[in-house]
Amino acid sequence: MKQYDIRLAKVPQPPKDCTGEPVMLTDATIQERLDKVLQGMKNRGLEQLVVYGDAEHCGNFQYLMGYFTRFEEALLVLDANGTAHFVLGNENLNKASKARIPGQAVHVSLFSLPNQPNRADKTLRALLEEAGIAPGRRIGITGWKHFTSPVENNEKLFDIPAFILDAIRAVTGGDENLFNAGDLFLGEGGARTTNNANEIAHYEYGAALASDGVLDAMDLLAPGVAETALGAQLNRQGQHNSIVTIAASGPRFIKGNMFPTQNTVKVGDTISLTVGYPGGSSSRAAYAVRDASELPQGAQDYVEKVAAPYFAAYTRWLEEIHVGMTGGEMFDKIEEILPRAVYGWSLCPGHLVAEEEWLCS
């Protein structure tokens, strides 16, 4: 195994590289996305696809629609021939015309905030029928996840609200022709697992915005600086976060709080900085010290025992990654240099990102 000579040293500060100018997805890119999804439906033998979206679970819906419906639920009902219906609540009905693909809107007030005006003329079942859902068709349902459990029937796990799933079942007569179709977006060869040049530029804006924010927050670190001041460096340009912003000094989650407070940085504190936008997140964790003598008792070999091995693994990752490499190959290479039994990591050495901080692994 290749050995690395990792040393703590001063180096020039990396330049910030966010252009500050979001890159829009072109019409050609949206058509390419639609073509990929329709081909995936054909490969799965699906006659219809129902894609769910809300503020927390928006990526698959937004992939074709171009926007997400914030505080309301929504459905994109896509037929194999490309015909689309947008099932929208009160405050998103006026955005049907803003969708990046052509389609017809169906107004479902049940998707709206509590106590807003409700339609009294049709049930949810009737409105889903109006959107084209019908018995006898093979229908894929995409919520957020592509399930890969070794002990569950993944095709029959549906991660959408029960009241919507119940109404779909009422139309179709049960689950027989309903299948989880998260793999069309997130599975091996899924539509969202590869990007064209336009998509890469689109996502790079968010990734660079996040890394610039972390760099500025690190530059601000000093005894007496409040977590809120650090957090102000992380959230920027009014963009939508893909992950909870973290600016923490010392103990975290006091009284359940996850967000920056007026607590200030103290010498010897653990520091956590994280921010993410569509396209990527950046995170740094370390100690607020000037040298090893200020590290807490029992952690004075932190650089040698933790930071240097992690940096070596990161270097290995960058050197080894290449087109055609399997996730298993990368996993083994990181396991070799940073064994889980010693360092205690438990997820994986890398994952895909998009609108979500974690798309799939």
Where are the regions a protein language model picked out?
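Active-site neighborhoods and metal-handling regions in enzymes and metal-associated proteins
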Residues: 1-361
